[in-house]
Amino acid sequence: AFDLNDFNTLEDTYDQMNVFQLSEAGLTHEGRDMKSWIDSLTHCRSHLDEDVFMFKRNEPDSGSACVGTDLNRSSNNPCSDTYGGSGPASALETRHSYSQQYEDELNQRQRYEPSGTTVNNLLNKDAGSIYSYTPELR
């Protein structure tokens, strides 16, 4: 049986994961299944900066006169400020949001900024941002 306070076998872990809708991403070099799920109900940590207002993304919703999807919300009403989209990961941004990269409209390829550069300082220290990482699975 799966126990959060103990080391669990791979089989027990996979059995516990069956409560989720799983996707298979292929095989490891050992021939084991790589299983994953999308956790789309993680709270957005809006308390980190009370001066920032999060706007809905500005893409028109098909079949509706309303515009916008809030990637961190789950309303089914397309005209609501908390409309979460037509389904899980329906917005392209949710498929990219796993990473710790800065991207602007000029990026044509993946690029990393070395520590101490203006961009790195702006995004971290100079902006006074708090680094937050939310996976809570043990």
Curated annotation (Swiss-Prot):
Active site, per annotation: E136
Classification lineage: Eukaryota, Metazoa, Spiralia, Lophotrochozoa, Annelida
Full protein name: Carboxypeptidase
UniProt pH dependence: Optimum pH is 7.0-7.5 with AAFP as substrate.
One of the GO BP terms on file: proteolysis
Region (Disordered): 61-123
Domain of life: Eukaryota
Pfam families: Peptidase_M14
Disulfide bonds: C66-C79
One Gene Ontology term of the molecular function aspect: carboxypeptidase activity
